[in-house]
Amino acid sequence: VNQTEIDIYTEGKPEEATYYGAKLEPRSGIYAGIVSDGNGNPEDGSPETFHHDFGVYSSYLEFDDFQTQLNKPSSYIVPEKNCISQVPWNVVDINLVLDSANDEYIKETLDNMAKYNKPTIIRFGAEMNIGYLGDSPTAYIKAFRKIADMVHEYPNFAVMWSPNDNGSLDRPFGYFYPGDEYVD
């Protein structure tokens, strides 16, 4: 559904919402954005769906493919906009993250994201409590902490922890929480 207006409902006033002071956390309100990977591509002539600015542009990276750059059109859109870049960094084989042989890949990817000079939220290993990432909370936590430590070396980057709230009953998302110091 292509809608240009949305309604947002809150309990109470936005200025009364709890504020934790985390990196890139809005003082009140929310960030609204789109996954920009499917929002047209100037190289293949596909049309732009959304013709106005958003506060957040999201573009997926695939760790297992050793992808180091944003997909198009995000690689065109993000530099042009006054926005936050949100990067869902998916991983299937958590052991790839733990393997120090891939540390240079992680650093190269983060360096590439830093070149956009935008506030950036890295959403690593999302929905870990369902599917293929749900088999080892210990390995997931270790990998998340490794990524978070590397992300926190960048002054305008933050880390998002994003479980699936409908996870399996035998894999509650609390088992995967890496700790407050790793999550912004």
Question: Where does each model-flagged region fall?
Answer:
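Generic detector of short, locally flexible boundary/turn motifs and exposed helical patches
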Residues: 17-23, 88-89, 150-152
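N-terminal carbohydrate-binding/catalytic regions of secreted carbohydrate-active enzymes
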Residues: 24-119
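Active-site cleft segment of glycoside hydrolase catalytic domains centered on the general acid/base Glu
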Residues: 101-183
